[in-house]
Amino acid sequence: MSLLTVERVSRRFGSLVAVNNVSLSVEPGELRAVIGPNGAGKTTFFNMISGFLAPTSGRILFESEDVTRLLPARRVWRGIARTFQVTEVFPELSVRENLRIATEVAAGYRRRPWISREADAEVSARVTDLSDMGGLSDKETRPVGELSHGDQRATEIMMALALKPRLLLLDEPTAGMGDQETYNITQLIRQLHKDHKLSIVLIEHDMRVVFHLADRIMVLAEGAMLAEGTPPEIAANEMVQAAYLGKAA
């Protein structure tokens, strides 16, 4: 049974068709990549999966349940978490405080005026684990806004992981990074995928990252699916070469 099934979704903004009749199926534990030129509809597609936009037509199933009209928070509770093109963190708070907020949200504690000592200890232990997994333990007392772009992105990814998702959506996780930061984030994604058996769908422009990580790749162009296949199949696809990979080269 597929974890995520996107059935023929479209999104129109007036006369503009941003996403046109796109389908996608993601299996448990699979790592998918979505690529395409700027303006291909990738982020709009993500926004529909995560609930920030409603499709004009089509439907979205998560674990066979129709979530097409669910709000983003409801989808988080179902097991869908995401990061954004522009890193979404609390820059004035420390790494640890950011991770604690996400952990408390996942546990339902943010809606309570107080929590027990035992619960507080569990949250603290979970935050420490997240910090260690993200390679952030030596920076966890620093404000996130003072960190490098790569460490800010790692913080955001670990905040998403704190929500205990079964599906993690990563929107251009290495955008704006140099080679070392790109390598670090790529290794982090690979390790999280392996250790937590997560299903991951990522949007990415760096083809080194895509071909290193993805089990399968979907190519969007002008809002429609141009091709789908394994990394070798996509690399050899002449239509993809003409529309995207050839330009990137």
Describe each model-derived feature in a short phrase.
Residues 1-249:
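Glycine-rich phosphate-binding loops of nucleotide-dependent enzymes
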